[in-house]
């Protein structure tokens, strides 16, 4: 098992020059990070207040009062029992009280994580100073014992860790660790890292299976994967042990959530409390049974993705086959039965959760942005367990589609929910679709998604490469332009990559040898393996492998075929004596694929979706007119001649006015080069009277029978214009659909 393991390259060892991802990172650096800092400080007009930095300042001020007053200091009484605290007067919040959701601290942690990634490659003294000042405030809020969660610091520490199910202290720890590690790696500054270690040490003392410890685990997972990261940075075994404990203790009986609920009901004299006896009651938390007994992805999709990521991490580092098998079972259930064609997961608004197998609604899809990001986390860690192209294919789809759809092209508004079909009229009128927004929002009270997008975009290079634990193989999982640095069998190697994805499948990688640790000449050949993913979207593994050629594979003379090839699990392994300046070129076919869903996916029966390369496409009303449910792909024409689907590069012009007085849906004028598809199609004509009503016909009486005797549908020839899914809703409120009727 261990021979398959690999680890990602350090952030500073991969430089992104890729035109696509460099533009995304530049957008995050110049627009999103400053915008989100304003949001954390409640300085975005029209946006829901965050209260994040308000809470840290309040906790820091309380600590200062405690230091000044000494024994005379009276700690705050417990006044907050809910999930979200709001000020009585929103215009004048009390500077000493906690507001927002119980996990509000994490908004800062995710923001500073993105800042750390950005500063690693783009030094910005002003941004770094802002972050340092914010870190000073956060660290000033920490208690002497290491505890750091403003919800309880400002609401009676006697209640700390008494409601693990609902009040997310361990979730806050996880994000604090992630942010602290990123900022340390990006800047070399360890103030926040030391604070995170102190909090982790406090938790390590309190939790576990030893006498006197709390046999608990996070209600909302992420601490598991974060503690692994802390272990990898510090080398402290106790952090890995704590992560393993959280993973393996979860779901064991008696349930800690039940125990604490009973204790809290007694403490609060809650006469209405009734114990929950549903045997499946903690499926929402992935805690209905121990993970080694789980075989279906259930519950809150983001929590699940984070938990499965930590599971895969621990399986790799503990070399635990049972945990690895559990991770693979859960992966298979997601990919085979619960994955949207856009790389999204979690189809139901009820609990922001996975539904039953094959239940993948389109217009009511939840498909939270954070859930797609959690899937990318999980996929990356499955790749570290074992290099299989399927993991990278899914990771790539999640990154290019749902993750990027979560952010407007100007970086100033965001989707929490990512449907695959939108009728704005229904969104405004149908309470069942209350969660679906036809345009992006400026901010959210529960603002987990915007900073999550920022942190994964700024660290996307960490998803592109891993190095085998034996040090002999460099894996390329994502094709993006840049320079990757690794040590392979003792030789410093640089891979200088140019790539034109996601719009074209071509590019090359130039091998640069920098010598070994002893300073051997850079020109000396070195033996190692370069393994390149064969993208599933090519459609044929052999065709994908044939699209890759390397110098040294078929030379004449004594050096004939000094580099050999082998295909394993969707990767092409090129092994041999590499020379400085050798190149690996690739030119992957990028056919337009017309996909059909499994027949058990009822919502998609008789429909098709279009994918090219890693990009899923959609139709918007702006290009195709209203009533997209009457637009059909001409599948017969496409099957007869696949080339009938035309690929066209074009300049996509984004820009829209807000749809309300808060400016929701507003997008600044932006132009981005991308690809659109022109697909043979046909339309069902509307009844003449309805068609005459024109725009807004849904709001006027339809002067045609509601029902009529069946007659064959007339076909009006049309061409469907499809744009990348991530670009939808950047031109104002309009209909959208991913799946077209066939």
Language model features with spans:
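Low-complexity, Ser/Thr/Pro/Gly-enriched N-terminal "stalk/linker" regions
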Residues: 1-107, 132-151
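Hydrophobic core segments within long, regular secondary-structure runs in both alpha-
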Residues: 18, 25, 37, 112, ...
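C-terminal beta-rich recognition modules with glycine/proline-rich loops and embedded aromatic residues
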Residues: 13, 19, 25, 243, ...
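Beta-strand-rich binding/interaction modules
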Residues: 524-554
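Well-ordered alpha-helical scaffold segments within catalytic/enzyme domains
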Residues: 21, 112-125, 174-189, 223-235, ...
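A conserved hydrophobic secondary-structure block that centers on an alpha-helix together
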Residues: 155-233
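Solvent-exposed loop and edge beta-strand segments that line ligand/cofactor-binding
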Residues: 5-6, 64-69, 86, 90-108, ...
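Structural helix-adjacent loops and short alpha-helical linkers that scaffold large soluble proteins
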Residues: 4, 9-11, 15, 119-132, ...
């Amino acid at each position: 098992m261990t021979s398959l393991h690999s680890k990602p390259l350090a952030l500073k060892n991969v430089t992104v020059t890729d035109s696509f991802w460099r533009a995304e990172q530049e957008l995050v650096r110049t627009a999103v990070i400053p915008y989100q800092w304003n949001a954390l400080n409640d300085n975005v007009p029209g946006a829901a207040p965050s209260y994040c930095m308000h809470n840290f300042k309040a906790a820091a001020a309380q600590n200062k009062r405690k230091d000044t007053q000494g024994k005379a200091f009276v700690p705050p009484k417990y006044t907050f029992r809910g999930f979200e605290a709001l000020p009585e007067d929103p215009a004048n919040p009390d500077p000493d009280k906690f507001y927002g959701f119980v996990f509000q601290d994490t908004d800062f942690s995710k923001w500073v994580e993105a800042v750390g990634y950005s500063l690693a490659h783009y030094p910005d003294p002003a941004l770094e100073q802002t972050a340092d000042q914010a870190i000073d405030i956060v660290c000033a809020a920490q208690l002497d014992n290491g505890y750091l969660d403003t919800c309880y610091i400002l609401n009676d520490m006697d209640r700390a860790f008494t409601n693990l199910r609902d009040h997310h202290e361990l979730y806050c720890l996880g994000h604090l660790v992630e942010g602290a590690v990123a900022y340390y790696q990006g800047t070399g500054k360890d103030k926040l890292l030391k604070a995170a270690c102190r909090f982790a040490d406090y938790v390590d003392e309190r939790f576990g299976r030893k006498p006197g410890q709390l046999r608990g685990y996070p209600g909302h997972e992420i601490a598991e994967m974060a503690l692994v990261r802390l272990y990898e940075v510090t080398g402290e075994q106790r952090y890995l042990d704590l992560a393993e404990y959280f993973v393996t203790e979860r779901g064991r009986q008696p349930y800690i959530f039940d125990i604490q609920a009973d204790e809290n009901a007694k403490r609060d004299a809650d006469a209405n409390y009734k114990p929950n006896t549903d045997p499946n009651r903690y499926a929402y938390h992935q805690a209905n049974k121990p993970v080694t007994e789980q075989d279906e992805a259930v519950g809150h999709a983001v929590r699940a993705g984070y938990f499965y990521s930590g599971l895969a991490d621990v399986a790799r580092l503990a070399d635990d086959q049972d945990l690895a098998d559990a991770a693979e079972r859960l992966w298979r259930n997601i990919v085979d039965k619960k994955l949207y064609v856009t790389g999204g997961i979690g189809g139901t608004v009820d609990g922001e959760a996975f539904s039953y197998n094959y239940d993948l609604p389109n217009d009511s899809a939840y498909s939270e942005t954070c859930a797609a990001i959690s899937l990318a986390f999980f996929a990356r860690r499955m790749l570290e367990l074992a290099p299989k192209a399927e993991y990278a294919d899914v990771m790539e789809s999640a990154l290019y589609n749902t993750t990027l759809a979560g952010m407007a092209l100007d970086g100033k508004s965001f989707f929490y929910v990512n449907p695959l079909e939108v009728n704005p009229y229904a969104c405004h009128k149908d309470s069942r679709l209350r969660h679906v927004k036809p345009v992006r929002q400026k901010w959210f009270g529960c603002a987990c998604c915007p900073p999550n997008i920022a942190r994964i975009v700024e660290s996307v290079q960490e998803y592109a490469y891993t190095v085998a634990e034996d040090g002999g193989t460099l894996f390329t999982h994502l094709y993006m332009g840049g320079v990757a640095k690794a040590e392979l069998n003792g030789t410093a190697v640089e891979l200088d990559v140019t790539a034109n994805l996601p719009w074209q499948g071509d590019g090359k990688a130039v091998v640069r040898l920098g010598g070994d640790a002893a300073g051997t000449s850079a020109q000396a050949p070195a033996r190692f393996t370069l393994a390149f993913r064969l993208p599933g979207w090519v459609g044929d593994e052999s065709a994908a492998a044939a699209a890759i050629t390397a110098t040294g594979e078929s030379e004449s003379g004594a050096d004939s075929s000094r580099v050999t090839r082998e295909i394993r699990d969707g990767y092409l392994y090129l092994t041999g004596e590499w020379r400085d300046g050798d190149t690996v070129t690739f030119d992957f076919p990028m056919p337009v694929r017309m996909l059909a869903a499994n027949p058990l996916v009822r919502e998609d029966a008789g429909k098709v979706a279009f994918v090219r390369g890693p990009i899923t496409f959609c139709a918007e009303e702006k290009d195709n007119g209203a009533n997209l449910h009457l637009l059909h792909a001409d599948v017969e024409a496409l099957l007869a001649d696949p080339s009938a689907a035309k690929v066209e590069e074009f300049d996509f012009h984004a820009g829209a006015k807000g749809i309300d007085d808060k400016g929701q849906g507003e997008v600044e004028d932006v132009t981005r080069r991308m690809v659109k598809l022109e697909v043979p199609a046909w339309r069902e004509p509307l009844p003449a009277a309805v068609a005459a009503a024109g725009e807004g016909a849904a709001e006027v009486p339809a002067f045609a029978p509601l029902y009529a005797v069946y007659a064959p549908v007339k076909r009006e020839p049309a061409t469907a214009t499809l744009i990348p899914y991530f670009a939808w809703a950047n031109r104002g409120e309009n209909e959208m659909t991913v799946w077209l009727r066939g």
